[in-house]
């Protein structure tokens, strides 16, 4: 392949998908069947979606190869994080509290275990005051920065922040979260993917049975995954058209 040919080929778009806050075997199976890439287990005891380490390990054993278990922690002790991750084969960590870069680094066993760091972005116009570039630089050891809306508690609030206020160029892999549904994820992917290295999406409340936190709806899971794939197809079409433009 010549350099000229390489320049005109469109980049392939495939958005990775994580479903978070699972508590039941049937929901894990439904997510895997739908084709998700990662499953999140909440180990924060104050969350209505909380599961024990033992339960997370039990559910994670249902996962096939190449579907990653993600353990969500909020201001947990380093020793307990390391022990929990060691109990769930193939797990990576997600830090969703007030953990400093140094604390994340230590809890990841100095980079031996990949981790995500959540950024809690204020809702509405207040989001413009959040310095994502500095946050991404401070947590540059993280595999990705997860973008969530700042709400009471830590995550799973079902609210979306203003995506248009994000910086135009973030030197990091991003995970878009917060208030996503099958109805808005295409818009979210379209707005955010051009701003970062790669984009993944993370959903919890948007695929739940109404009023039942931690209980997922298989139809909503499948609808969400289908919407993400439509977004990928749309971006691929746009990239192809751009390459054909003189």
Q: What residue ranges belong to the model's regions?
A:
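Hydrophobic residues within beta-strands of alpha/beta enzymes
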Residues: 39, 93, 145, 196-197, ...
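Alpha/beta enzyme core
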Residues: 28-34, 137-140
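C-terminal helical cap(s) of enzyme catalytic domains, especially alpha/beta-barrels
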Residues: 53-63, 106, 189, 204, ...
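Glycine-rich, proline-tolerant flexible connector loops at the mouths of alpha/beta enzymes
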Residues: 38-55
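Short hydrophobic "strand-cap" motifs at the C-terminus of beta-strands
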Residues: 19, 177, 204
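Conserved anion-binding
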Residues: 43-47, 60-177, 181-185, 208
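N-terminal amphipathic alpha-helix/helix-capping segment at the start of soluble metabolic enzymes
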Residues: 1-20, 241-245
